[in-house]
């Protein structure tokens, strides 16, 4: 399935049905009086977060969503039928924005969460409502209220506990494939990963979700490479895993490039808890490894873990470091496991 994280939709709620002008016509009743019914209410347009979805690709093929209008009122005080609602099923983590793409209407972060996008119009009153002591036979009724029309944007930000960041070919996809059942495309050329990938990772009996996004390069915030459009998918992460290619000539420069791009995208993202790991250590001799680790620690001002996604050396230590930062922010129910009953 193709990945799409931004879609434009046009929604319109149903208009209310018109009220009816009608009079009671019955044998032996000379002045039956008004009996026109009210119009039915128009249908609403809703958005609902649905589990199991992870792309907005469905909205590439259908952009227009119109709810049904209410039925018109009828004689004998019969109210028109209400119009059917229409529901847009979107992935969990979808933001709904106004046409300007800046004003956030809603952020659907929980399965089953719903938000009203366009309210249906009320039905018009039939002539029965206008009967009074001075007007015993009103000959007018209200039209129904028109529906609401809106142009909206849907923007998906995947929800993951940990987000992978790094330059192209830093080994992010290899790492994700090594620790989860995710099978991202892996090759020895830049930008092999063209869209985010999710994987469920387990360590010491705990599980969490990890997101791998396309690599960043210098100037990504200005549109170079694939730009920084995918950073939104790690914006919700509780911790970032910054992978640095140990075979690079200047690991400190590589780390600085990523930190600069994170800061340019969002200062809040740059301040997130972060684990830094020097990858591909299986390709380095001990002396070079020690030099590059020291240079990287001096650049970031903190400890650097060593690992190899290919040989899996040091992978467990990295996962434990991630979990130690994820666990405090987890709700107790999120990590509760079913245990056998004990008397």
Swiss-Prot record:
Subunit structure, per the record? Answer: Monomer.
Q: Which source organism?
A: Paracoccus denitrificans (strain Pd 1222)
Give the Enzyme Commission number: 3.6.5.-
Q: Which PANTHER family match?
A: DEVELOPMENTALLY REGULATED GTP-BINDING PROTEIN-RELATED (PTHR11702), MITOCHONDRIAL RIBOSOME-ASSOCIATED GTPASE 2 (PTHR11702:SF31)
Q: Tell me which residues make up the OBG-type G domain.
A: 160-327
Obg domain: which residues? Answer: 1-159
Which keywords annotate this record? Cytoplasm, GTP-binding, Hydrolase, Magnesium, Metal-binding, Nucleotide-binding
List GO terms (cellular component aspect): cytoplasm
Stated name of the protein: GTPase Obg
Q: Which SUPFAM superfamilies match?
A: Obg GTP-binding protein N-terminal domain, P-loop containing nucleoside triphosphate hydrolases
**Gene it is expressed from:** obg
**One GO biological process term:** ribosome biogenesis
| UniProt key word RNA-binding | no
Q: Which cofactor does it need?
A: Mg(2+)
């Amino acid at each position: 399935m193709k990945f799409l994280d931004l879609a434009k939709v046009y929604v319109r709620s149903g208009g209310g049905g018109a009220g009816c002008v009608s009079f009671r016509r019955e044998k032996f009743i000379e002045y039956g009086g008004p009996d026109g019914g009210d119009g039915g209410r128009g249908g609403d347009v809703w958005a609902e977060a649905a589990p199991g979805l992870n792309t907005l690709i469905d909205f590439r093929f259908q952009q227009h969503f119109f709810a049904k209008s209410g039925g018109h009122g009828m004689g004998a005080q019969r109210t028109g039928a209400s119009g059917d609602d229409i529901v847009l099923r979107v992935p969990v983590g979808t933001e709904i924005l106004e046409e300007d793409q800046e004003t956030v209407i809603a952020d659907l972060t929980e399965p089953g969460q719903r938000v009203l996008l366009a309210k249906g119009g009320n039905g018009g009153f039939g002539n029965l409502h206008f009967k009074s002591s001075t007007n015993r036979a009103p000959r007018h009724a209200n039209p129904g209220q028109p529906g609401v029309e809106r142009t909206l944007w849907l923007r998906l930000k995947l929800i993951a506990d940990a987000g992978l960041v790094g330059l192209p070919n830093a080994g992010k996809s290899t790492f994700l494939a090594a620790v989860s059942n995710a099978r991202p495309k892996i090759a020895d050329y830049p930008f092999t990963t063209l869209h985010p990938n999710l994987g469920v990772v387990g360590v010491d009996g705990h599980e969490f979700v990890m997101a791998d996004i396309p690599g960043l390069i210098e100037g990504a915030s200005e549109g170079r490479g694939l730009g920084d459009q995918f950073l939104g998918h790690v914006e919700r992460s509780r911790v970032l895993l910054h992978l640095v290619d140990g075979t690079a000539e200047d690991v400190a420069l590589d780390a600085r490039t990523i930190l600069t791009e994170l800061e340019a995208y969002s200062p809040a993202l740059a301040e997130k808890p972060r684990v830094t790991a020097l990858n591909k250590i299986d390709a380095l001799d001990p002396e070079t490894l020690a030099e590059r680790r020291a240079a990287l620690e001096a650049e970031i001002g903190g400890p650097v873990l060593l690992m190899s996604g290919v040989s899996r050396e040091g992978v467990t230590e990295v996962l434990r470091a991630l979990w130690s930062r994820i666990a405090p922010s987890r709700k107790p129910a999120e990590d509760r496991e079913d245990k056998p009953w004990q008397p």
